[in-house]
Amino acid sequence: MSKGIRVVLWSFGCEGKSTLLYEGFKGIKNVKLIPTIGFNEETINFKGLSITFWDIGGACGVKELRNNYFRDCDALIYLIDSSTIIEHKSHSDFTDNFEELKKCIKIIDDMPLLIAITKIDKRQLSTYDIINNYELDKLFNRKNKFGIIECSSFTGQGIKEILFWLNNLVKK
């Protein structure tokens, strides 16, 4: 019998959660997606591990329910879109995204956290610059398992690394 974990995909808005789930993890290409209302749930198997993903919509009102989703999960993947990060830098949405991340960190306490830097095939800012400019390196001092992986659902880069990261959680 395979072990199983539950993982929440979370971000402030349209960072690529559903695309990561369907094109990246499920391998379904050219999926026509609309903004998620509520959540999507899908399960995949990787190296004997059953991984159930909850793709939570970024709409207003859903954020207030984050505690309910986080309570029943084993890990959180927080997505940051590297293709629009410069555009957001001067807008409140960008600031709100990182404020949301800080709130999530307070809620999840010692739950494993992976930051997925998405859409690197269209990136405008390097992962190094994202980490430094927005002080993500301060998250490394957390007591729980933490990581940053850059990925592209379209090229497949980083997808297996995310799955291996999740698989390693169960081994420890």
Cite the ranges covered by each PLM segment.
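TRAFAC-class small GTPase G-domain
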Residues: M1-K172
